[in-house]
């Protein structure tokens, strides 16, 4: 493949992104990433090992570079081919196509620890025996406790302890000091 944009230039000095842009511009249609990568590799005359070492950077550059657009299913095109409005419409139509696909049935879950799922005799339902799970109505305890609290509010703060305990704690013997 000969690209007119790069006639007379050293292929070792060309970036893979520049070559990919020229290849897509020449072909005029979107290409799968694999085909685009192979075309870039063959144009730059890179060995498989050299190209494989730079392949991840090439893919990253395709994503980051604003002149390329991913069209889904790892197909790439030039952004200039698609007006902004058609990009939104293409994405919306792609979502509509997904809805037309048949819906996969969900598989029935199998419990590997039970020999027969229909035989529930040995299975214990732990959710139904917890009394804390049952809702209990809150009792009105304000009327019962109110007189007891009133008694405490009238309590005298000048309570005096018998001198026996306080006196023993505050007295120091001469023997205790040594």
Swiss-Prot record:
Q: Where is the composition biased (Acidic residues)?
A: 120-143
Spell out the residue ranges making up region: Disordered.
Answer: 120-178
Coiled-coil ranges from the UniProt annotation: none
* Alphabetical list of Pfam families matching this protein: HARE-HTH
GO terms (molecular function) for this protein are: DNA-directed RNA polymerase activity
- What Gene Ontology terms describe where this protein resides (cellular component)? DNA-directed RNA polymerase complex
Which residue range or ranges hold the HTH HARE-type domain?
A: 14-81
| InterPro entries named among the record's database cross-references | Asxl_HARE-HTH, RNAP_delta_N_dom_sf, RpoE
GO terms of biological process kind: DNA-templated transcription; regulation of DNA-templated transcription
Q: Mind listing the UniProt keywords for this protein, alphabetically?
A: DNA-directed RNA polymerase, Nucleotidyltransferase, Transcription, Transferase
Recorded family membership: Belongs to the RpoE family.
* Function field: Participates in both the initiation and recycling phases of transcription. In the presence of the delta subunit, RNAP displays an increased specificity of transcription, a decreased affinity for nucleic acids, and an increased efficiency of RNA synthesis because of enhanced recycling.
Summary of subunit composition and partner proteins: RNAP is composed of a core of 2 alpha, a beta and a beta' subunits. The core is associated with a delta subunit and one of several sigma factors.
Q: What is this protein called?
A: Probable DNA-directed RNA polymerase subunit delta
- Lineage start: Bacteria, Bacillati, Bacillota, Bacilli, Lactobacillales
């Amino acid at each position: 493949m000969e690209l007119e944009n790069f006639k007379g230039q050293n292929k070792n000095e060309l970036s893979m992104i520049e070559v990919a842009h020229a290849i897509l511009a020449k072909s005029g249609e979107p290409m799968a990433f694999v085909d685009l990568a192979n075309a870039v590799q063959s144009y730059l005359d890179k060995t498989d090992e050299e190209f494989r070492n730079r392949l991840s950077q090439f893919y990253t550059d395709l994503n980051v570079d604003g002149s390329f657009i991913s069209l889904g299913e790892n197909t790439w095109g030039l952004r200039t081919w698609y007006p902004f409005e058609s990009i939104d419409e293409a994405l919306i139509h792609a979502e509509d196509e997904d809805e037309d696909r048949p819906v996969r049935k969900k598989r029935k879950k199998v419990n590997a620890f039970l020999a027969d799922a229909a035989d529930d005799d040995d299975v214990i339902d732990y959710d139904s025996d917890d009394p804390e799970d049952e809702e209990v109505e809150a009792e009105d305890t304000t009327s019962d406790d109110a007189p007891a609290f009133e008694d405490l509010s009238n309590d005298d703060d000048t309570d005096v302890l018998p001198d026996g305990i306080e006196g023993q704690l505050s007295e120091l013997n001469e023997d205790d000091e040594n």
